[in-house]
Design a protein with these regions (language model features):
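Hydrophobic alpha-helical segments
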Residues: 1-181
Length: 181
């Protein structure tokens, strides 16, 4: 994974260049994260997409059936497999902001099997890795392992999180969006 040396393929739009509705998203992101991620500065070129993605990510990565910090670590792990330094950095920061420890963040980026995770959390990371290779790897045998430790809502969130972070790093890398400072 290497950072971007070149300019983004689509310009980053600053707050004074966007509609009031998108400015509201920028304000919410700034309040929540302390920064407006560069991905949103590119998505702002298509307001309906920026609004939809913001709503999707808020509902996906917030505390729900699974804790937000864990879903951010899943996003970090998948982003690492996608070789997206931007997404690894962004989701490591979000995991930290939502309560993940530095040891957990480091383990999610490395040997999670030896990390400070429950067996269920390790199984979730294995699920993300299998899904990354092929959805067919979530076969009946593996799915029965998930069902043994996760509720249906948790399984849906786990798979949706892992699947979503197959998309976002690809978007970022294809458009050469620079890592948010």
């Amino acid at each position: 994974m290497e950072g971007k040396a070149s300019a983004p393929r689509v310009p980053l739009l600053e707050r004074d260049e966007v509609s009031p509705e998108i400015a509201g998203i920028y304000d919410a992101l700034l309040k929540q994260r302390g920064v407006v991620p560069n991905m949103f500065k590119v998505l702002a070129h298509t307001p309906v997409l920026a609004i939809g993605m913001a709503g999707f990510l808020k509902s996906l990565l917030g505390d729900s059936a699974l804790p937000g910090w864990y879903k951010e670590l899943l996003a970090t792990r998948v982003s690492l497999m996608q070789q997206s330094s931007y997404a690894v950095s962004a989701h490591s920061l979000s995991a930290r902001q939502k309560g993940a420890t530095e040891v957990q963040i480091t383990a999610a980026k490395g040997d999670f099997e030896s990390g400070p995770f429950s067996e269920a959390e390790k199984l979730g990371f294995r699920c993300a890795e299998r899904l990354h290779r092929s959805p067919k790897e979530i076969d009946e045998g593996f799915f029965s392992q998930l069902k043994a430790v996760y509720s249906d809502p948790q399984i849906v969130e786990l798979v949706a999180t892992a699947a979503a972070f197959e998309l976002f790093p690809r978007l970022i890398e294809a458009l050469q969006i620079p890592t948010t400072p």
